[in-house]
Amino acid sequence: NSTRFIIITNQKIFRKDAKKVSICFEIAHESGSLYHMLSHFIYNNLNMTKIESRPIEGRNWEYRFFIDFDGNLADSAVKNALRGLRDEARNMKILGNY
């Protein structure tokens, strides 16, 4: 088990020394949809360190994925991967860069 403590703000704060990014998104319940999402990490040579899925309440067989990966929001590879993920995901959110 692990516990995370976070500070929530409505302001975007970018740190140059941040080394990890956390995101979440939803995808359709279709064959290969998760594979296509994860390919953005492979093509941009990003190291995914954690993935979790949680069922979406009231929507059978649909899940929200929480992913941590190494990088900084200022990195071009991270920007490129996030652009691709946004194009394919539903409700993608950047949870933090720390």
Predicted regions and their residues:
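Domain-level signature for soluble enzymes in the chorismate/prephenate branch of the shikimate pathway
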Residues: 1-98
